[in-house]
A protein has these predicted regions:
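Conserved aromatic-histidine-acidic binding/catalytic patches
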Residues: 3-11, 48, 112, 144-155, ...
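Charged, alpha-helical interface segments at or near domain boundaries
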Residues: 34-131
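Short coil/turn segments at secondary-structure boundaries
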Residues: 74-79, 177-178, 229-235
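Long, compositionally biased intrinsically disordered terminal regions
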Residues: 171, 182-183, 187, 201-250
Length: 250
């Protein structure tokens, strides 16, 4: 019988799930790992839910860094931020290969599991790169800069360092409307990740009277050259689903 280990869709829970699956000693071919919510249940499978444990997460992370490489850890972390259903099981299989081959496993793209990890990492990295360019802030009451995004992958912790470096003395928030989480950066302090309640989300979603919104829209429309408009090229470089929270398209 196949045993399926399941957990919440966050990094701590996923690393704990890896720990428990490995410690079960059921055999790598006899287990699968999935993030919740689980869609269709498979027949003849034993499902085991795993709760996040910070100590077990730290143990797994130490093992990855010391027995494989720091590069492999970064690869695993970014793949864990993906929205792909197979990401957790792919991470587990990659770690099995990594503990066998060592640091060079990241170069073994001929191995299907390594290639799949590379694809997950690349997709997440590309999305994070786009959001660094497309994030727009609005000034909320209390002089807090707030931005809303709805990324497919969980890229908040990947884009936050960029804005922490560029806006170190500003109070700002980047809110993931899809996951109800936010990166909060108090002025001249380190940023942190937090979960938002529905009431907090509603309060932070109110329209602001920031005058720079209209100024930016006017600038965007004014610099455009009508004879050179190419909407197909624009959609290729800036997909439509990014535009919901972009000031110039509202």
């Amino acid at each position: 019988m196949m045993t399926v280990f399941t957990c919440e869709d966050n990094f701590d829970a996923m690393m704990t799930c890896v720990y428990e699956a490995w410690a079960s000693r059921l055999g790598h071919s006899n287990i699968k790992l999935k993030t919740e919510p689980i869609g269709n249940l498979e027949l003849f499978c034993d499902y085991r839910h795993v709760d996040a444990d910070s100590e077990k997460t730290a143990s797994v992370v130490r093992s990855i860094k010391s027995k494989i490489s720091y590069q492999a850890y970064i690869m695993i972390y970014e793949a864990a931020m993906s929205d792909a259903e197979d990401k957790l099981d792919t991470i587990y299989r990659f770690m099995v290969a990594g503990f066998h081959y060592g640091a060079h496993v990241v170069d073994f793209l001929q191995e299907p599991v390594v290639m799949r990890m590379f694809e997950l990492k690349r997709k997440v990295g590309n999305e994070a790169h786009f959001h660094v360019e497309f994030i727009r802030f609005a000034n909320m009451p209390g002089d807090v800069l707030v931005s809303h995004i709805e990324p497919k992958s969980n890229v908040l912790t990947l884009v936050a360092p960029h804005f922490s470096d560029r806006l170190p003395s500003e109070n700002w928030m980047i809110i993931d409307d899809k996951r109800f989480i936010a990166v909060v950066h108090p002025a001249d302090q380190d940023y942190y990740l937090t979960t938002l309640s529905k009431e907090e989300m509603d309060r932070l979603s109110i329209q602001t009277d920031d005058p720079f919104i209209d100024l930016w829209k006017d600038f965007f429309n004014t610099i455009g050259i009508k004879e050179r408009e190419n909407h197909q090229c624009q959609r290729n470089l800036m997909p439509l689903w990014y535009r919901k929270h972009m000031t110039e398209f509202q």
